[in-house]
Design a protein with these regions (language model features):
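Conserved SAM/SAH-binding beta-strand->alpha-helix loop
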Residues: 32-33
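A short, Lys/Arg-enriched amphipathic alpha-helix followed by its capping loop at the start of a domain
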Residues: 17-25, 42
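Conserved SAM-binding strand-loop segment of SAM-dependent methyltransferases
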Residues: 45-52
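Class I SAM-dependent methyltransferase "Motif I" SAM/SAH-binding loop
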Residues: 7-11
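Class I S-adenosyl-L-methionine
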Residues: 56-67, 75-215
């Protein structure tokens, strides 16, 4: 199996997808305790660290990781926020690049909101791409929509892929799924069975247990 290290792991959506794709998670890092609890409840065997990624050293993982991934915080670039970009203390693109330099993974994958493609962030975006390429990666960036890949929701996301130069100089994103579905049509009875409809129907239970029903 391929090895991966993921930061900003959240409740584990991306981690579970990578698991299905054949990746063995060496380490998952998440800051929010409730999300960490969800991860641990669903996959007790995973090494989940509930910590600030600024305090994570990638040096112990040098040349041990195939994929370094992370859905770094969206608020700095989201249309729903103030779009402070690099001036937002929650911007973790620099930390992802630092870890890539320390770990030297074969592939780097970064996910963020489509606001990252806004013109106002063009200089910052170019800087990020250049820094990844300076580390020795062929870098590709594209806006993808989860519904085009069989996920029952509209979720456009920017995905940046960096492939180490010594491995290949070509890369292409997967073809789109022409039979995409989203909303009620896509979720059907699965979501009806899994999701509580309102707070009154939700018993008092830990975030981990509630999340476990969804995953």
């Amino acid at each position: 199996m391929y090895t991966s290290l993921e930061i900003c792991a959240g409740a584990g959506g991306q981690a579970l997808g990578l698991e299905r794709a054949g990746f063995n998670h060496t380490l998952l890092v998440e800051y929010e305790p409730s999300y960490c609890a969800c991860l641990k409840a669903n996959r007790p065997g995973w090494d989940v660290r509930c910590m600030d990624v600024h305090n994570l050293s990638g040096i112990p993982y040098y040349n041990r990781i195939d994929l370094l991934s992370g859905g770094v915080p969206c608020p700095p670039f989201s249309h729903a926020g103030k779009q402070l970009g690099a001036d937002d203390e929650r911007d973790l693109f620099p930390e992802m690049i630092r870890l890539a330099a320390e770990i030297n993974p074969k592939v780097v994958m970064i996910e963020n909101v489509r606001g990252f493609l806004d013109q106002k962030f063009s200089e910052y975006r170019e800087r990020i791409i250049n820094e990844i390429e300076t580390l020795g990666y062929n870098t590709h960036i594209q806006l993808l929509n989860a519904s085009d890949y069989g996920v029952p929701q509209l979720r456009p996301r920017v995905v940046i892929i960096g492939v180490r130069n010594d491995l290949t100089d070509t890369f292409s994103f997967f073809n789109l799924n022409s039979n995409s579905h989203y909303g009620k049509k896509g979720c059907g009875d699965t979501v009806d069975e899994a999701v509580f409809r309102n707070e009154a129907e939700t018993p008092r239970r830990s975030a981990a247990v509630s999340c476990r029903r969804l995953l």
